[in-house]
Amino acid sequence: MISTTTHSVEGHEITDYVGIVNGEAIMGANVVRDFLAGISDVIGGRSAAYEDKLAEGRQIAVREMEDRAAQLGADAVVGVMLDFETLRDGMLMCVATGTAVKLRRRS
């Protein structure tokens, strides 16, 4: 499955717009990681624990979006947008949204 932030796929023609698809991931962060991330923030460092959690959330959300597109018979998802939010109690949310399309390779 091709997923792209652009509105076209190079070398292909969009033959049908199947619909809007999305995937979500809501993940908890634990107390130790929150504490260590707070220390990193105070001293100006990067929080690898949170970066890893964000990457994991992004992968899950994109995979879910692609799975939903495949269920609709799509070949690709174009115009993909990612949104990250911090929810209460240390919960992280990632949402991937795009348009599922059918493609034909250009001659």
From Swiss-Prot:
InterPro entries: UPF0145_dom_sf, UPF0145_YbjQ-like. It comes from Halalkalibacterium halodurans (strain ATCC BAA-125 / DSM 18197 / FERM 7344 / JCM 9153 / C-125) (Bacillus halodurans). Belongs to the UPF0145 family. It comes from the Bacteria. This is UPF0145 protein BH1111.
